[in-house]
């Protein structure tokens, strides 16, 4: 293993049309995952993107460390064509296959900032994370808000948006120690935003002392 290289394993989970595949592409700086607007679910199978290599991303022990990001894209839950049982089995199998030995550093629960988070759909999202990650899910989950430009269009700051969030969303944020990230679809440089998001993800991982969630 290269001592000057670090591999970070991530998974994107969430509702259909929440922007999981698009978010995965931003993290990778590529187009590994097929993403388009559609009235129903687009992603039907899990797939691993690993095209992201950033040289000299950070320093450790006086040495520059290169970063490789691996992102597992997953079908939406609930899915417009697949049963809930099928989606759970597909994602669980993929987590075990891709991260069974190396482990998962962080799961990103993707949620559109311009959509409400409450009721049964909110419960389903949290339940999915709990079932897939087990009792330690709170330590390995962050919320990724997509379409964050809608917040500014509404005349709100990120802080004001969170203050006005539903009880269900606030409860979830409290559960994951307020680990959250905002992803802007417009008005920001993709490359700059990508680096900022990865730096924030690394902060979360450092807070976890680089521990991983194993699926063996």
Curated annotation (Swiss-Prot):
Keywords annotated in UniProt: GTP-binding, Nucleotide-binding
GO molecular function: GTP binding
Residues of the AIG1-type G domain: 5-216
Protein's UniProt keywords contain Nucleotide-binding: yes
Cross-referenced Pfam families: AIG1
Keyword Zinc appears in the UniProt entry: no
Positions bound to GTP: 14-22, 35, 147-149
Family statement: Belongs to the TRAFAC class TrmE-Era-EngA-EngB-Septin-like GTPase superfamily. AIG1/Toc34/Toc159-like paraseptin GTPase family. IAN subfamily.
The protein's name in its UniProt record: GTPase IMAP family member GIMD1
Source organism (scientific name): Rattus norvegicus
Organismal lineage: Eukaryota, Metazoa, Chordata, Craniata, Vertebrata
């Amino acid at each position: 293993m290269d001592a000057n290289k670090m591999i970070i394993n991530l998974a994107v989970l969430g509702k259909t049309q929440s922007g999981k595949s698009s978010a995965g592409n931003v993290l990778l700086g590529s187009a590994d995952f097929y993403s388009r607007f559609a009235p129903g679910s687009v992603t039907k199978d899990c797939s691993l993107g690993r095209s992201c290599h950033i040289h000299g991303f950070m320093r450790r022990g006086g040495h520059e460390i290169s970063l490789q990001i691996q992102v597992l894209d997953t079908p939406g839950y609930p899915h417009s064509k697949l049963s809930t049982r099928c989606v759970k089995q597909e994602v669980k199998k993929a987590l075990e296959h891709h991260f069974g030995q190396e482990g998962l550093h962080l799961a990103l629960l993707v949620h559109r900032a311009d959509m409400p988070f409450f009721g049964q759909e909110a419960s389903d999202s949290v339940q999915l994370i709990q079932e897939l990650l087990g009792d330690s899910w709170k330590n390995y989950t962050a919320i990724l808000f997509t379409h964050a430009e809608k917040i500014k269009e509404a005349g709100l700051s990120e802080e004001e948006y969170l203050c006005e969030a539903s009880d269900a969303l606030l409860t979830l944020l409290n559960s994951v120690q307020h680990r959250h990230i905002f992803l802007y679809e417009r008005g920001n440089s993709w490359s700059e935003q990508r680096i900022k998001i990865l730096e924030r993800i690394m902060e979360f991982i450092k807070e976890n002392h680089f521990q991983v969630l194993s699926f063996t």
